[in-house]
């Protein structure tokens, strides 16, 4: 089905939940603590879709590998989770990642655009053996 009638324009839909599923599966396989976490910027479907995928990737890993990795920050059944309420504050990204780390998470996937850079800064300070970040929507290398 072609939605756009402009000949040199193509619309595209990316299944973010599928990419996040793979990230969750990978996180479940890499965690040393058995706890991973996620948080969002704003509670909207483009964000919660990522969080759903991450959660279900961890759950699939658990079912296939006999592990019991726990996901903090999101419940796909109730659609309840952790949200900063913005996509700008690096301080919030740092604080949310710190809280998840303090609860045992050694891998965190912020779904909050540039807010995740605050989480990445915390991971850089703690060291990658302590905390790993899965980046979304922003260049995490800066």
Give short role names for the model-derived ranges:
Residues 1-142:
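A residue-level marker of the well-folded mature domains of exported/periplasmic proteins
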């Amino acid at each position: 089905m072609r939605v756009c009638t402009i000949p040199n324009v193509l619309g595209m839909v990316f299944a973010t939940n599928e990419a996040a599923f793979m990230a969750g599966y990978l996180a479940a396989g890499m965690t040393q603590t058995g706890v991973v976490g996620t948080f969002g910027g704003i509670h909207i479907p483009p964000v919660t879709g990522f969080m759903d995928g991450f959660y279900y990737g961890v759950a699939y890993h658990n079912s296939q590998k006999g592990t019991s990795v726990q996901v903090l920050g999101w419940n796909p059944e109730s659609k309840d989770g952790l949200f900063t309420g913005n996509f700008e504050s690096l301080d919030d990204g740092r604080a949310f990642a710190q809280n998840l780390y303090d609860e045992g998470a050694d891998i965190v996937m912020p779904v909050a655009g540039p807010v995740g850079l605050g989480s990445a800064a915390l991971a850089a300070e703690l060291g990658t053996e302590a905390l790993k970040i899965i980046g979304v929507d922003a260049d995490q290398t800066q």
